[in-house]
């Protein structure tokens, strides 16, 4: 019989798990709160489960509690593009837990208060899936609006909020002199449908869901963009007030409604556990009928005096709870498994489903990720499967209903050739993905690479989104990126003395186009004929060369001609050029081989040379370096930084002459450790490398 772990072993295991959870949650918090549109790498339901696990471990092992834990921090940091705003009263999040648990905790507190006369009634409201904000009024005038941010500090969105018609700009004279109204900015489902249609019409990729649409619209640096979007607002709380204006949550909401704010009509005042359960079930059933997205129910004690007596933690009020709906699941038929081809040649199995309604959306396909996923869950054509919308966003095929499987069904066999071009498919060791070897001769890869070429972080050409790329590609007008810059020549109306090919009508005569939209597209393309080197490198879509790697290459090679010449010489693995390439921090042999392979294709060289005839690719210019005591030092950042984003910290370090590396090695001079630093800190300790806290780093770079 195996011995059970010692107490010390158990603590070590728990400490590692807590660190792992904190890093995963903090990483997804950054993605969610600091991106436009917000995103996560895991679904909301999984995120909540991880968060609960971390809370439970910290509760059971209080010696591992930390003020820097995600369980003690609200939201995310402030975007660098907005002015910072301090919340006079913190915008706390509401803890995800069953209302029964909240009531049990409240009753325990009441018992300690020795006040048996206190009655408990609850205000229940739908949990709107939008973007929280706080709107401040002084002398009845709207003076400022801010996002939640990290709960203590948000983004100043005052100008953008002025364009939302459902937010009053002036309050009645009976309102307090100073009051902060808090609520949710959202986009209704019907407005989102129209907005999506508009985006598709102009060839732009629409946001994935109304929540992303609302968040992306509100956090625009150009207020005219926000004004053009159909945003709405529900009020449900308040922050700082100069004087009390209600005795209960319910009465306060009615007062807000009287002042001109929209308050959700589905809010209820409830008095018993049966009513609470019935309301939750009712709203879960009705959610697909509503014209706004909800992902659960928020419960609050109705009595404001009781709220005050019950109090709050540094993260969340004790008098409130948020209970999320579980993912909605449905059974449907797996009609087929098709293979999609990405720009890098990745072959992805896709489930073609008998259309099924999930939360008001018709789901007809879902990714099956890779061969291992298909084989592990044994998905077969004509199976009855369970599909869900986890996080109410991405459809997932969860499992097979084995008892409904037809006799004679056969396992799915992954293809050995690309379904589009017929080229051989290969799967590298330790890789989960099969890839087409056809390269740019594969039409599917060509199309996806064209989409990537004009994407936001590449050429970012207004009006030339995925839909229009597909349109021009299917018309035979686009085969390679250089064709984009020939569109005006081919599709503009001919001048009197010009002879032009007759097979293409002028773009302004196409369905859905006119003179203005055609000219706008041509103008947008012309404005992008000057581009920085790193964006050009990224736009080429070389496998494993993302935005960061593209910047590293631009920094090292400075000009397009120098980079191209060096990469051609690097085809010889023993050459000095190849050895230099693999020695660059952040590149390595795997990425280097992808770059060299790209330049080994004659077609790619032809495209590059043709693009040079249309483009001006700017040489990489290093920012002016300030002489300092860290000049020439190699530094590594690890963990979560509190005062600035990792990207901003890197830029600042480079400004002072330091070189920022991604991994710790014997060459590293300094490691700056934020919260939850992980393995890099341990390695630095083992190597005896100087370790600084974020504050110590600040002091070092500011020393004269």
UniProtKB/Swiss-Prot annotation:
Top-rank taxon, per record: Bacteria
Catalytic activity line of the entry: NAD(+) + (deoxyribonucleotide)n-3'-hydroxyl + 5'-phospho-(deoxyribonucleotide)m = (deoxyribonucleotide)n+m + AMP + beta-nicotinamide D-nucleotide
Top EC category: ligase
GO aspect biological process, one term: DNA replication
Function, as annotated: DNA ligase that catalyzes the formation of phosphodiester linkages between 5'-phosphoryl and 3'-hydroxyl groups in double-stranded DNA using NAD as a coenzyme and as the energy source for the reaction. It is essential for DNA replication and repair of damaged DNA.
Catalytic site: 127 (n6-amp-lysine intermediate)
GO cellular component: cytosol
Annotated BRCT domain residues: 625-704
GO terms of molecular function: DNA ligase (NAD+) activity; metal ion binding
Signal peptide (UniProt feature, chain positions): none
Name the record gives this protein: DNA ligase
Claim: Ribosomal protein is one of the keywords in the record: no
Entry's family note: Belongs to the NAD-dependent DNA ligase family. LigA subfamily.
Keywords: DNA damage, DNA repair, DNA replication, Ligase, Magnesium, Manganese, Metal-binding, NAD, Zinc
Binding site for NAD(+): 44-48, 93-94, 125, 148, 184, 300, 324
EC nos: 6.5.1.2
């Amino acid at each position: 019989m195996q011995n059970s772990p010692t107490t010390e072993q158990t603590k070590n295991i728990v400490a590692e798990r807590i660190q792992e959870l904190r890093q995963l949650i903090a990483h997804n918090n950054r993605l969610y709160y600091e991106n436009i549109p917000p995103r996560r790498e895991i679904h909301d339901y999984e995120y909540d489960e991880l968060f609960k696990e971390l809370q439970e471990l910290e509760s059971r092992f209080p010696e591992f509690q930390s003020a820097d834990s995600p369980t003690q921090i609200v939201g995310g940091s402030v975007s660098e593009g907005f002015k910072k705003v301090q919340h006079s009263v913190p915008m706390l999040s509401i803890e995800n837990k069953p209302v029964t648990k909240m009531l049990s905790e409240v009753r325990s507190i009441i018992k300690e208060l020795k006040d048996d006369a206190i009655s408990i009634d609850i205000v229940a409201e739908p949990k709107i899936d939008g973007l929280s904000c706080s709107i401040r009024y002084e002398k009845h005038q709207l003076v400022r609006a801010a996002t939640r941010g990290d709960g203590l500090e948000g983004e100043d969105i005052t100008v953008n909020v002025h364009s939302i018609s459902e937010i009053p700009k002036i309050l009645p004279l009976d309102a307090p002199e100073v009051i902060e109204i808090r609520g949710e900015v959202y986009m209704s489902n019907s407005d989102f449908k129209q907005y999506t249609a508009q985006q598709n019409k102009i060839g732009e990729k629409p946001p994935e869901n109304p929540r992303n649409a609302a968040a992306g619209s509100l956090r625009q640096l150009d207020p005219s963009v926000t004004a053009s979007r159909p945003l709405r607002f529900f009020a449900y709380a308040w922050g700082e007030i100069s004087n009390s204006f209600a005795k209960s949550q319910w009465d306060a909401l009615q007062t807000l409604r009287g002042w001109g704010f929209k308050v959700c009509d589905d809010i209820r005042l409830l008095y018993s556990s049966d009513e609470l359960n019935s309301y939750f079930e009712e709203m879960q059933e009705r959610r697909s009928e509503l014209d706004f997205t909800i992902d659960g129910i928020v419960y609050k004690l109705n009595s404001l005096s009781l709220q005050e007596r019950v109090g709050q933690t540094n993260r969340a009020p004790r008098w409130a709870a948020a209970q999320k709906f579980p993912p909605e699941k449905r059974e449907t038929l797996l009609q087929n498994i098709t293979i999609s081809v990405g720009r890098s040649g990745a072959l992805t199995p896709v489930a073609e489903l008998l259309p099924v309604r999930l939360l008001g959306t018709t789901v007809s396909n879902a990714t099956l990720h890779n061969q291992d996923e298909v084989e592990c869950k044994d998905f077969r054509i004509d199976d009855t499967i369970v599909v869900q919308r986890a996080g109410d966003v991405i459809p997932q095929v969860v499992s097979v209903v084995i008892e409904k499987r037809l006799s004679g069904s056969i396992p799915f066999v992954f293809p050995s050739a690309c379904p589009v071009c017929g080229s051989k498919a290969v799967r590298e060791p330790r890789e989960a993905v099969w890839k087409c070897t056809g390269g740019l001769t594969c039409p599917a890869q060509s199309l996806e690479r064209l989409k990537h070429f004009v994407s936001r972080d590449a050429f970012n050409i207004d009006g030339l989104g995925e839909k229009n790329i597909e349109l021009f590609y299917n018309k035979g007008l686009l085969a390679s990126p250089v064709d984009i810059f020939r569109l005006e020549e081919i599709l503009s109306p001919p001048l009197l003395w010009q002879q032009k090919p007759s097979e293409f009508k002028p773009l302004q005569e196409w369905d859905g186009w006119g003179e203005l939209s055609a000219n706008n597209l041509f103008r947008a393309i012309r404005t992008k004929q000057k581009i920085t080197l790193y964006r050009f490198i990224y736009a080429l879509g070389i496998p494993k060369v993302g935005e960061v790697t593209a910047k590293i290459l631009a920094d090292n090679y400075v000009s397009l001609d120098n980079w191209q010449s060096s990469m051609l010489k690097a085809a010889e693995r023993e050459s000095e050029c190849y050895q230099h390439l693999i020695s660059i921090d952040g590149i390595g042999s795997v990425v280097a081989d992808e770059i060299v392979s790209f330049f080994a294709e004659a077609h790619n060289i032809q495209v590059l040379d043709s693009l040079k005839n249309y483009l001006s690719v700017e040489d990489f210019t290093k920012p002016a370096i300030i002489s300092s005591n860290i000049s020439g030092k190699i530094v590594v950042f690890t963990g979560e930084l509190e005062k600035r984003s990792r990207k901003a910290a890197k830029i600042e370090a480079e400004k002072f002459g330091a070189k920022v590396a991604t991994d710790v090695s014997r060459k590293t001079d300094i490691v700056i450790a934020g919260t939850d630093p992980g393995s890099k800190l341990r390695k630095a300790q083992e190597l005896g490398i100087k370790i600084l806290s974020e504050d110590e780093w600040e002091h070092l770079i500011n020393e004269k």
